[in-house]
């Protein structure tokens, strides 16, 4: 069993904050109930969404990154997860970019930081993801990722507040591209009336989206072009 455990803070250093031990990790538990092992680490908060690709069997996650570096840092992301991989938190991000709040710490980790597959807007607050395996949408949607973007709370211009589609082109692999799929939760004056949280495929092949802004569950159905 794999469990995503978010960090207990924004960027507290586990070296000096022992309460961060085994946080910002994806942990692997065995049925015997023994101590967990670390499947991947340095993932600040993937608690919103982990799922296995039906095409490749790989684990994927959507990640809420850290705050406090302005509007344009640090990007949230969606990525397949390499077992044993390090994704940067809290010292590094997006490959070899060091968080200035931890300048000079852990230089030995710089070249180990994995760059994610799909880079999103900073503060998008990417939550649950799912792979489309229904029969209602067109064939080109098969195996693609849908992800709920809860929306920013600390950015001067709002981002997120939508469901995005990550095309995997029936290969199970991302190219870095993504597209808006379900939008309209931000009105012209910048006010927000909906915030997507969860997304799943219904038995009839439609897409169900939970929204804690309007306290609704939306059904997205395909009726033809």
Region spans (language model):
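Loop/turn residues immediately N-terminal
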Residues: 66, 214-215
């Amino acid at each position: 069993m794999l469990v995503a455990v978010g960090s207990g803070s924004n960027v507290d250093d586990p070296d000096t904050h022992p309460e961060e031990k085994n946080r910002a990790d994806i942990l692997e538990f065995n049925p015997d109930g023994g101590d967990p092992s670390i499947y991947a680490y340095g993932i600040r908060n993937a608690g919103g969404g982990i799922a296995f690709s039906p095409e490749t069997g790989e684990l994927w996650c959507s990640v809420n990154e850290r705050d406090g570096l302005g509007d344009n840092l640090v990007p949230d992301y969606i990525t397949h997860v390499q077992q044993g991989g390090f994704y940067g938190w809290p010292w590094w991000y997006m490959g070899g970019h060091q968080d200035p709040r931890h300048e000079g710490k852990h230089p030995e980790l710089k070249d180990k930081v994995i760059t994610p597959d799909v880079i999103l807007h900073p503060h998008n607050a990417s939550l649950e993801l799912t792979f489309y395996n229904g029969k209602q949408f067109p064939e080109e949607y098969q195996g693609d990722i849908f992800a709920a973007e809860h929306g920013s709370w600390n950015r001067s211009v709002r981002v997120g507040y939508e469901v995005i589609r990550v095309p995997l082109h029936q290969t199970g692999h991302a190219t870095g591209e993504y597209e808006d799929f379900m939008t309209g939760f931000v009105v012209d004056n910048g006010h927000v009336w909906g915030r997507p949280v969860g997304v799943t495929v219904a038995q009839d092949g439609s897409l169900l989206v939970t929204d804690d802004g309007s306290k609704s569950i939306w059904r997205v159905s395909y009726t033809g072009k």
